[in-house]
A protein has these predicted regions:
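N-terminal helicase ATP-binding lobe
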Residues: 1-175
């Protein structure tokens, strides 16, 4: 018996297998802010893909996918480039010069590091309101003065969906 693949107009055919728990988690994350806690390797990024595809279907573009390291940001970017049936996806890190970043921020889907995002929001290079969905990978890092905290604080009161993903939660001591 072969595995069933996700069928969606914004997901490349035969690129992602259907897993009921991912579909169920994504269904909830489409309708409310969520923190998804799943062990490494169980497909948190695939859950995010389902949510992103839903936002694209509804015309609710403007997706910001944040990850704490350039390596993770690049992994998410490559995954989305290979699984989403659109070309309007950009990768932004601190290695990109200011003028290049200004042009990259206009894409529908942005994969970026939180520090450059926080700094470019402060510089008014990017407007947080251009996003309808912000995904925080490794969300357990959102403590203290980490850039995730500053970004999330700016979302307070705005109708921007937030999706946090992590394999671990911080202990009380870390908080």
């Amino acid at each position: 018996m072969s595995a069933k693949n996700v069928e969606h107009k914004f997901i490349v055919p035969n690129s992602v297998e259907v897993r009921d728990y991912q579909v169920n988690l994504a269904s909830q994350a489409k309708n409310e802010n969520c923190l998804i806690i799943l062990p490494t390797g169980l497909g948190k990024t695939v859950v995010a893909l389902h949510v992103i595809a839903d936002y694209l279907t509804k015309g609710n573009g403007g997706v910001l996918f944040l990850a704490p390291t350039k390596v993770l940001v690049n992994q998410h970017y490559e995954f989305l480039k290979n699984t989403l049936a659109i070309d309007d996806i950009a990768l932004i890190t601190g290695e990109d010069l200011l003028e290049k970043r200004k042009k990259l921020w206009i894409n529908s889907i942005i994969c970026a590091t939180p520090e450059i995002t926080r700094n470019d929001i402060a510089r008014k290079i990017v407007d947080i309101n251009q996003f309808n969905l912000i995904i925080f990978d490794e969300a357990h890092r959102a403590v203290g003065d980490y850039a995730y905290v500053a970004i999330a604080e700016q979302l307070s009161g705005l109708s921007i969906r937030m999706l946090g993903m992590t394999a671990t939660l911080p202990s009380e001591k870390e908080k």
